[in-house]
Structures are given as C-alpha cells and as structure tokens.
Amino acid sequence: MKTENPLSFDYKSAGVDIAAGNALVERIKPAARKTVRPGVLAGLGGFGSLFELPVDRYRKPVLVAGTDGVGTKLRLAIESGRHGGVGIDLVAMCANDIVVQGAEPLFFLDYYATGKLDVDVAASVIAGIAQGCERAGCALVGGETAEMPGMYAGGDYDLAGFCVGVVEKEAIIDGSRVRPGDRLIGLASSGPHSNGYSLIRKIVGHSGLGLDAPVAGRALGDWLLEPTRIYVKPLLELLKSVEVHALAHITGGGITENLPRVLPVGTAARIDTAAWTMPEIFRWLQRHGGVETPEMFRTFNCGVGMIVCVAPEDEARTLEALSSLGERAFAVGEIIAGEPAVHYV
C-alpha cells in the first residue's frame, strides 16, 4: 500500500529565512548609499560590485587589498547588545592595514555569518560598517549575509571585512627608506581597538566585575567596546606634505611584533615607554590580570594605534601636521642600527 508523506519542508523550516535576508538588504541600502564615492558603478544587490579605477589620477596604479575580522571583541558586543561599534572596528582593521602602504581605500565588502538572522542586529552592525567606511573614505559596495543554522549558537555571529585601495607605484610605503636616526611618532589609540580580547575577556572574567563596573570614570564596557580609531584620512593628508618612511598599524602582537614588520634588515627600533601615558584601561588590565609589562607590549597597543617613521628633520612638522588634523601624536622613539626588533627604554 502506498502512503503519502504528510511532511512538506521548505528553506525557512530548515532555518534559512530568505525574506529576512531581503528585508536586511532593504534596511541597509540607505546607509550604503551614504558611502558612495566616485568610481562606484552599481548599488547593492548585484552578483558582483563594479568600481571604476581613477586611472586619470595615477600613472602606475597599484591595488592594495586587505582582509581582517574583529576577533572575540564580538563576544562582548553580543553579550552587551551593543553591535554598531564592531562594524566600525571591522572597517578600521582593514583600512588601517592598507593605508600603511600609502594606499587610499576605495571600496569595502563585508561577510556576516550567523546561525539565525536577526535583522535588527545585522542592520546595526552594517550601519556601523557604513559609518566606518565614511570615516575611511571608501564605499561599501557589497557583502554577504550567511544564515547557517547549526553552525552558530543562539544570537552569535561572526564578521570578516575586505578592503581594496590604490597607490601610485612609486609612492608605495614599504619601509625601504627607513634609516638609523629616523624618528618614530605614535598616534593615540582609542583603547584596545580590536586585539587582545581573548586575554581581556579572561581578565574580566577573573575579576568578577560586570561591564557596568566603573574604571577611571567610565564603565568598563565603554572602555572595551570603544571603536577602533580609523587613521586613514589624516595619514593620507600627511603624505601630501611629508615623506613618510614607514607606517606600522599596531594590532595583535602590539608594538613588539608589528613595528619590526616594516623595518629593513640592519635596523631596529628604540621605544621610550615614558613618552606617553598608558590609558587607564591598560593599567586596569595589567593590574587585574597580573600581566607582565613585556607581555602587555606584545599583546596590546598600550595606547599607540599607529606608528609613523620619518626623517629627523621632518619630526617637528609631522607632529604639528598630525595635531592640526585632530590626532594626538607624540614622539615615541627612533630607529637604531641592529636587526629588526623593538628595544624598550
């Protein structure tokens, strides 16, 4: 005897809501439109994103691409329900990486993955991404929202970003001009940025304090969820008037690991840790986590989010220019002879 199967499955019953995805696209279109810049040839929703290179402004244009994420800072955002800032973080991590080679960010794409799509949460994140793109001067031209039931628990989500920029071939900053005697200038960070959060979360958990606990006049959560500073516009403006020998984005690994990445063979860096005041959040983390000072500088930015290397004769005007552009800049050290490494004094 033949029996009829009473079940009738569809994609939504399997955990993927196409209608919710479409609703999200409509929600984020106004935010994406605010980021449009010359070169954008199509809006969101196509199979691919189109961008016309500004070849009239370059003799030999070179594309520079970067990709990154926000790491476990997302866990704090999810637990606190504060999602917009991590969108800014995502753009910052990618755009700051490519500007260190002298590149002007052109466009950005994002990847948002979750187990069950919450349109409000995703829209908040992507609104933050659009805000970050405005700060970096790049266009949000597309992205992917992946709803993957069974892959992520509850309201968890993950982010990845992709940024493409352009630089004149002769103007690429690769560290090759760095010489002993060059000066190092630090740009203040806004906090831990988007690195070291696995250790941060461990310390916070050990402390037994909630994100609303006061730390130096601010809630702990406000310190930890402060968006990563985007240095793109002031640095691009600086490059118009100063020959920058190297730039180092101080991310995971701190100054200890990141500064040597831009130093040529035969050079090292001497950093004066008394040249700036370490923000209170880092002192709090060191105190509550019992973190040794070398480990602090190898894990966190410790208040310095970007380092600029210039010739000695350009130090004063670089500091003046960065200050006039709204950055807190301070002389932090110099280049010395030696193998690529950081020596703290």
UniProtKB/Swiss-Prot annotation:
The cysteines covalently paired via disulfide bonds are: none
One GO term describing the cellular component: cytosol
Q: Kindly list the GO molecular function terms attached to this UniProt entry.
A: ATP binding; phosphoribosylamine-glycine ligase activity; phosphoribosylformylglycinamidine cyclo-ligase activity
Report if keyword Nucleotidyltransferase is assigned: no
Q: Where in the cell is it found?
A: Cytoplasm
Concerning SUPFAM superfamilies, the annotation shows:
PurM C-terminal domain-like, PurM N-terminal domain-like
Name the chemical reaction catalysed here.
2-formamido-N(1)-(5-O-phospho-beta-D-ribosyl)acetamidine + ATP = 5-amino-1-(5-phospho-beta-D-ribosyl)imidazole + ADP + phosphate + H(+)
Q: Which biological process annotations from GO are given for this protein?
A: 'de novo' IMP biosynthetic process; adenine biosynthetic process
Biochemical pathway: Purine metabolism; IMP biosynthesis via de novo pathway; 5-amino-1-(5-phospho-D-ribosyl)imidazole from N(2)-formyl-N(1)-(5-phospho-D-ribosyl)glycinamide: step 2/2
Q: Which NCBIfam families match?
A: purM (TIGR00878)
| PANTHER family associated with the record | TRIFUNCTIONAL PURINE BIOSYNTHETIC PROTEIN ADENOSINE-3 (PTHR10520:SF12), TRIFUNCTIONAL PURINE BIOSYNTHETIC PROTEIN ADENOSINE-3-RELATED (PTHR10520)
The family classification in the record reads: Belongs to the AIR synthase family.
Q: What is this protein called?
A: Phosphoribosylformylglycinamidine cyclo-ligase
Q: Which organism is it from?
A: Methylococcus capsulatus (strain ATCC 33009 / NCIMB 11132 / Bath)
Q: What lineage, starting at the top, does this entry show?
A: Bacteria, Pseudomonadati, Pseudomonadota, Gammaproteobacteria, Methylococcales
Give me the gene this protein comes from.
Answer: purM
